[in-house]
């Protein structure tokens, strides 16, 4: 522990002298109020400290005391369904303790509730050899999440005591005799520094798709469990709604939602909606698997920078249990702006658009903590973290540094388009500019698992949309009637794909989520119509006759998005009806 005194205060940056025994990344208590801060630069005996609370009212001469510990999070039962701020202060208990709707400075409240008791069920017995990562026992944290208590990193030896029963997170639950003869006394809780990634046994290639229930994503631009994706787009294009939809319906075990510098109303929406929504995979409330980290735009800027790391560290903890985790960061641009502000106050040499030169490496550090891994421990298990970050480029200009540095790292780009959003086409993901480098892996995985030709259908559908884009300029110049019959069919089918398949209403109880079997049935119907109509044209039928003769079945295809999942056979039955009606047009002899 080292005590110095403040010599400079500049917004969230405080400079203290007499800190020669302090270390970089140490947590400090700043001023008489004891504000939480972190040392980010050392020069001789002077330490530059970024303070995670409002610094108004503190001045030179006030004390600064280091704790000797880096910024860490508490990991244990009580994380799920909880809402924290950027440095893991529990907002609900904070409000009750301070009787204030705003964060009172200098108040220290433990991240995990010290009074709550959890029923611990041992899985190992006394005398067994254990290594770091082994699961000692479980706590049923919510109806859907079994919290697995693991041996902490760098601890191994013989289990000499383990107790069943109800315990708080600080009670001693087990004892391990280590190789040096010392006894390690463990509780249900462990801590971990947020800027250090948790170790794994092996990194694996991600192949299993993350099913989001959003048709444009799952069909054309899938992300794998363990992948990394970015959602850049201008204001009002629907970034937050896309993130909310994935948080609600993705087929993962745990969701970590980080609201980083965005509007407080959006976090309020999450708090209001999530408890009422039912997870289609478990039948329980979505809050039963969700951790919320709220660092809204009116909270201290420095804490934004920490909130992303807090979220990914909690995600790694659940991954190490063997769970699949999705972390949503909304928005990484606000996080980068916090980096820029602190860099400016430190008088560092600016890079592009004033961002620090190390912006790219910081973004890479975050996304590289995602992935599919084999975890530590003698019991073999796999876990995944899927990182999905929203990016808010000013004016929708994706050539700005945050977007460009993000695109170098991630493998899935869901580019939101302002013209699509203005036409009320949501999700406004542009199918011509977006991409997924997992497309081939996911396609092969689905073809193998489903024994279908899914990847071929996706390729055909995308070819139709690309052909439509190439014909659009001709149509604008000389009109639709100037096109050949085949090209007019392509334009009609492309419109069907856009309006009846890609367009999705997030606020409709049925259309908000589409399972993979339903997606395949819907796409098959549209492609069958294209195939059969194309054959009919080659046999001499007229385009207008085909469109008139199939008007009823095309209308049913358009409405199939509103057919509930349990009536899937109704959608599948439309394939035969399409073929039958086109054959009927040919039989009438429209040649």
Swiss-Prot record:
Residue numbers binding ATP: 233-240
Native organism: Streptococcus pyogenes serotype M3 (strain ATCC BAA-595 / MGAS315)
Pfam name, any one: ATP-synt_ab_Xtn
One GO cellular component term: proton-transporting ATP synthase complex
Protein keywords: ATP synthesis, ATP-binding, Hydrogen ion transport, Ion transport, Nucleotide-binding, Translocase, Transport
NCBIfam families: PRK04192.1 (NF003220)
Protein task: Produces ATP from ADP in the presence of a proton gradient across the membrane. The V-type alpha chain is a catalytic subunit.
Descriptive protein name: V-type ATP synthase alpha chain
Catalytic activity: ATP + H2O + 4 H(+)(in) = ADP + phosphate + 5 H(+)(out)
SUPFAM superfamilies: C-terminal domain of alpha and beta subunits of F1 ATP synthase (SSF47917), N-terminal domain of alpha and beta subunits of F1 ATP synthase (SSF50615), P-loop containing nucleoside triphosphate hydrolases (SSF52540)
PROSITE patterns: ATPASE_ALPHA_BETA
GO biological process terms held by the UniProt record: proton motive force-driven plasma membrane ATP synthesis
Family membership: Belongs to the ATPase alpha/beta chains family.
Top-rank EC class of the record's enzyme: translocase
Taxonomic classification: Bacteria, Bacillati, Bacillota, Bacilli, Lactobacillales
CDD domains: ATP-synt_V_A-type_alpha_C, ATP-synt_V_A-type_alpha_N, V_A-ATPase_A
GO molecular function, one term: proton-transporting ATPase activity, rotational mechanism
EC number from the UniProt entry: 7.1.2.2
